[in-house]
Amino acid sequence: MKGRALLLALLLLAGCGREQAPRFMPEGDAYPETLSQWGMLHLRDGHLTPAAEVLPYDLNTPLFTDYAHKLRTVWMPAGQAAQYGEDHFDYPVGTVLTKTFYYPKDAHGRLLKNTLDERDPAKGLALDQVRLVETRILLRQKDGWVALPYVWDEAQREATLEWAGASLDLTLQDDAGQPLAVDYQVPDANQCAGCHEERHGEGVRPLGPKVRHLNRELVYADGNANQLERWQAQGFLAGVPGPVADLPRNALFGHPRPDEPLERQARSYLDANCGHCHNPKGPARTSGLFLDAAAAMGINYGLCKQPVAAGKGSGDRLVDIHPGQPDASVLTYRVESTDPSVMMPELGRSTTHREGLDILQRWIASLPGNCQG
């Protein structure tokens, strides 16, 4: 009896230390109440670490979210792969995408506004160096994608499903020691779905993990690799039509490559931050302003185009993009504004992205021509 009791105790101890395997949930709506139940991210040795079967990824030019940093991951069921598509990948049922929003912090716990990458390629995020805010999950089920927002507790031990979202008043400190107030909003499930419905009536889709955003190198635990090549090696991507050098690629924000001039940087920024709504089938299609990667330069891209909004919404400026005159362009007015009734994007930020705005202003200033005649 004593031997059996000892064996049972050992088994129980082993079970306590066992990490949750990635959850396959092809259907149903009994979604886990806690993030740990998904098995995608583990708290291990003082770090938030992706599970062994889970791949981290990053984007060339990401969506701005009040200077939050983001740890992105992807997992697919064994033996399943996404099918390549230039505009969208066709992800298999059961795919789970996670995006953890966090801020770096100093030894005194002050949140920092910087662009440094805190991710350890082997271990993930050191919990004593970051403030975890939320983790958003996109789950591919048989009847489509589902968006699930999880909010981290102050102890950074667990994140809980919050259908209604959450609000946090944060203060960031820049390199000069100046404070920046952030009214951080965790979106509710409907807001998540609203932004991710890139084409009206076609349901939720991932916005970030597309070929033009993923086509870049990332530092993995075993060294640098192109993400598209790593996805193929992992068995997560099939049907790629050729070498990655021949595939679409957006500019690398903050560190543009030699072949990425100012116009490409600006267009990549607009694609990532505006194009999911401002495209011919998107929620903002009635504006006639199309800022996605496929849009041709011209009046529908905003050049000398009169805005649909007037008065306060346009800042009394006459055209969306006025060549040579960023201060006469509605586009820069709305990107700079933090007024909820004016600003674009209208969700996901309470501050102005100064670095992104600077790219747009310099690009518009460089454009030849005028809007006369």
Regions found by a protein language model. Give the residues of each.
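Bacterial N-terminal signal peptides
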Residues: A5-A14
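Sequence context surrounding c-type heme c attachment/ligation sites in exported
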Residues: C16-P26, L112-G373
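Extended interaction-bearing regions that mediate binding to partners or small molecules
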Residues: H108-R110
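Conserved small-residue
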Residues: E19-G85, Y91-V93, T98-K105, L116-D120, ...
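A residue-level signal for conserved active-site and pocket-lining positions in enzyme catalytic cores
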Residues: R4, G94, C195
